[in-house]
Amino acid sequence: MSNLAEPLLTPEQQTMRSLRVLSRLLDYPTAELQQAVGELVEIVAAENRWPASLRQRLMSWCQQIADSELLSLQAEYVALFEQGRATSMLLFEHVHGESRERGQAMVDLMDEYRKAGFELDARELPDYLPLFLEYLSTRSDVEMARWIGNIRHILALLAARLEERDSDYALVTHALLALIGAEADINAHRPVVKAEKPDNTPEALDAVWEEEAVRFSAASDEDCALQSAEGRRLAERKQGVQHDAVRILSPGAQPPAMGR
């Protein structure tokens, strides 16, 4: 991997790299992530849009990732993001659930990706947050801020839920909101989240499995396209499909097809 923290970057280039770091931190943990921690720390340290306290916490977490057992990191990730929907990495699940409105929202987002010259892996959905951040890392500052502004309510809710579970992954949502000066948005969600019933209990997870079993019996392509990515991941895990790493690219590099 090339040196990602080279000097003389413009603020916009620095934020592009910061977004790629956040994308990678939110994706399924791999040995590649652990090996790249030194470079991630350098990039985080150089991001002046984040307060010093947030940079320090992110850097400490990165080092903790490097020092942890990979299987433990992966188990934590699955328990946090793939058991229940409250902390789903699928943006539109927080807005539309599994309705057809979500399907249209995904089609619209896919169109945005294609206009920018990106093609997604057929296994991935466009509202997967690490993938979305990879896309934002290729956009201008103005466009990046607009997109983050559009999802700030989702990020703030997700931040509050991750805080409630004492997860360091909350740092990523804090960092995204900090890029547009919106960290205070989280305050309104904290009391609401404290009153929520957990959706990762055995009973709640059984209900999800039953719902997904019905979805996997859908006969039409349209119905299959509306399956939650959580359901797809459950099926992939049963079939032994491996997660691919989200890539971190240097500014100016030709963007690849997006996907995991």
Residue ranges of predicted features:
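Charged, alpha-helix-forming regions
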Residues: 1-128, 133-260
